[in-house]
Amino acid sequence: MSQAVQTNGTQPLSKTWELSLYELQRTPQEAITDGLEIVVSPRSLHSELMCPICLDMLKNTMTTKECLHRFCADCIITALRSGNKECPTCRKKLVSKRSLRPDPNFDALISKIYPSRDEYEAHQERVLARINKHNNQQALSHSIEEGLKIQAMNRLQRGKKQQIENGSGAEDNGDSSHCSNASTHSNQEAGPSNKRTKTSDDSGLEPDNNNAAMAIDPVMDGASEIELVFRPHPTLMEKDDSAQTRYIKTSGNATVDHLSKYLAVRLALEELRSKGESNQMNLDTASEKQYTIYIATASGQFTVLNGSFSLELVSEKYWKVNKPMELYYAPTKEHK
């Protein structure tokens, strides 16, 4: 393929280039005109929506003008201030913030894919706050424990040193009475020292116990347990043996989908036991999509819960009272 280019001169110059095999074979994609919808999992888009610096979802997206790579505004500005005047992805030269431009369209796309992002970020901040609180408490407890152990060892060494010095002084004088008094004095000095050492050792064991308790508490604290009263929906659930109130205690990090899957497996297992069957096919086909979880609002209406919501988030958003949370279940219409 050739192209004639007119220059300022009297005769045109011809420019020739060769097409690659891809360029020769490629065809335009056909436009979708029949209303077909293509479902794409948000997880498959994570690499496209992730900031290469913080490895989290892009926030206040900034795009480089030269190479068009995207970063969080805070991340790329911090990187430029630290002295690395280059793109973290391709190492292309970036002079300053003037080499960046905001990308509100990409932020709008992310908010369209993840409409509940604010709730997700609030949950992440709460989890990080719990982890930081536990780490600070554990570091303080460990520091106190080590300090008590060092103090106990120093007291013990001082007591032994005083015994040796008093004993050697008595031998040099050769006075038996003085030796007796010195040994008595040494024992008296060593006695309180040993007592103090023992007390310190005893007190040193207390942080161990507290530390052991703290080693368990953060796990419980990071995933605080939530008590549930799981009732059948008063209008959508048929009155049969499976329609009974269930009482559950589980982790606050469990999602509504986990609850639906548990309910499906539980009811399938109860059905097998009632029929006396041993076929496990019903358990394998149990899905979280079989049941829909509801919560009653203040207006007396039932709100369908998003399957990705954690129970802790549901409690903070809808329940807000210090008593077991009441949820309702009913078969999903597509699975009836």
UniProtKB/Swiss-Prot annotation:
What residue spans carry the region label Interaction with nucleosomes via an acidic patch on histone H2A and histone H2B?
93-98
Q: What are the EC numbers?
A: 2.3.2.27
Which key words tag this protein in UniProt? Acetylation, Chromosome, Cytoplasm, Isopeptide bond, Metal-binding, Nucleus, Phosphoprotein, Repressor, Transcription, Transcription regulation, Transferase, Ubl conjugation, Ubl conjugation pathway, Zinc, Zinc-finger
Specify where it is mainly localized.
nucleus
One GO BP on record is: epigenetic regulation of gene expression
- Record function comment: E3 ubiquitin-protein ligase that mediates monoubiquitination of 'Lys-119' of histone H2A (H2AK119Ub), thereby playing a central role in histone code and gene regulation. H2AK119Ub gives a specific tag for epigenetic transcriptional repression and participates in X chromosome inactivation of female mammals. May be involved in the initiation of both imprinted and random X inactivation.
* Polar residues bias spans: 176-191
Q: Where are the zinc fingers (RING-type)?
A: 51-91
Where on the tree of life does the source sit, at the highest rank? Eukaryota
Residue ranges of the region described as Disordered: 157-213
A Pfam family for this UniProt protein? Answer: zf-C3HC4_2
Q: What is this protein called?
A: E3 ubiquitin-protein ligase RING2
Catalytic activity, reaction form: S-ubiquitinyl-[E2 ubiquitin-conjugating enzyme]-L-cysteine + [acceptor protein]-L-lysine = [E2 ubiquitin-conjugating enzyme]-L-cysteine + N(6)-ubiquitinyl-[acceptor protein]-L-lysine
Q: What is the lineage of its organism?
A: Eukaryota, Metazoa, Chordata, Craniata, Vertebrata
In its record, the post-translational modification comment is: Monoubiquitinated, by auto-ubiquitination. Polyubiquitinated in the presence of UBE2D3 (in vitro).
Q: Which residues carry this modification: N-acetylserine?
A: S2
Where in the sequence is Phosphoserine found?
A: S41, S143, S168
Subunit relationships: Component of chromatin-associated Polycomb (PcG) complexes. Component of a number of PRC1-like complexes; these complexes contain either the polycomb group ring finger protein PCGF1, or PCGF2, or PCGF3, or BMI1, or PCGF5, or PCGF6. Distinct PRC1-like complexes are composed of a RING1 subunit (RING1B or RING1A), one of the six PCGF proteins (PCGF1, PCGF2, PCGF3, BMI1, PCGF5 or PCGF6), one PHC protein (PHC1, PHC2 or PHC3) and one of the CBX proteins (CBX2, CBX4, CBX6, CBX7 or CBX8).
Positions of the region Interaction with HIP2?
Answer: 2-179
Cross-link Glycyl lysine isopeptide (Lys-Gly) (interchain with G-Cter in SUMO2), where in sequence? K249, K323
- SUPFAM superfamilies according to UniProt: RING/U-box
One cellular-component annotation, GO = chromosome
Q: Which organism is it from?
A: Pongo abelii
Subcellular location field: Nucleus; Cytoplasm; Chromosome
User: In which pathway does this enzyme or protein participate?
Assistant: Protein modification; protein ubiquitination
